[in-house]
Amino acid sequence: MELRQLKYFAKLAETLNFSLASRELFITQSTLSHQILQLENELGQPLFLRNSHEVILTEAGQTLLPLAMETLHSAENCLLRLDELKNVMRGDLRIGVTFSFASIMAETLTAFLRCYPNVKVNVSQSTMADLMERLVRHELDFVLAFKPTASDPRIESRVLFNHHLAAIVNEHHGLASHDSITLEELQRYDLALPRRGTQARSAFDRLVTGTHYQYKVKVEMNTVYLLFRLARESNYVTLLSESTVVGEQGLKAVPIVDAQNHTDVMQGCIHLIRNTYVKNSAKEFIRMLGDSHSILRNSL
């Protein structure tokens, strides 16, 4: 069994399509078929069920897949460590970031690329659940996101800053001149809220638990970009972490008094796989992020 065969197997298991997998591997379809068949012969059992319509992983294939991914990840780390013995900063750096943290990371990304032009940075922006799943599968080197309410023993979360919930409005909104607002006062305004399950919405729901306030929730969505646009172009008030408006023109974060006095904070974190090797480029990016103005001015 060779690493090359495991790489081919993993790609086919991902795509379940010989034609697509061979294109992404830059090999011919016949080469891929031959290598998969050779691997199956070595193992003495089929890894895929094939017919004219589809390709399906067998039970043996499902068992092999996580082991193959772990082996490929270990081999990649071995090469990285040898490269880093030569003090060479290169290779790929794969970062996951939730929508709320994109603007915070932008400053560090620009500085990092300027300092280390030989490192190829791949940034994936998605939901926390998707990014955490990809982190566990070793598809990402680290994730920048809020600390989830339920912890995963496989993931280490390093706190960068603590934040509270705030009312986000456009700079011409009547609230923009206020130093703060209460949960009671929020009842007067039309709200555009993040959907349930997001960190900001969970923080808001915890704040209002046990109260009898009636809010005018007009819109719910899970896209920060659209919430920003709605806030900029209308008098809707949205509720997000204070950090989300860093670098955003035309928006103002108004602290919610009840949130400032509440012990339940939203913790911005770097998430990594626990007890695993962290490549030098990831360590350096994390260091630069911690020292960035975006983080320092948003730290308590």
What are these regions (language model features)?
Residues 107-111, 129-165, 169, 233, ...:
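Short beta-strand-centered segments that line the small-molecule binding cleft or hinge
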Residues 29-30, 34, 80, 86-116, ...:
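N-terminal winged-helix
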Residues 10-28:
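Short helix-boundary/capping micro-motifs
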Residues 40-59:
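A short LG(V/I)-centered, amphipathic sequence patch enriched
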Residues 104, 253-299:
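A late-sequence structural motif
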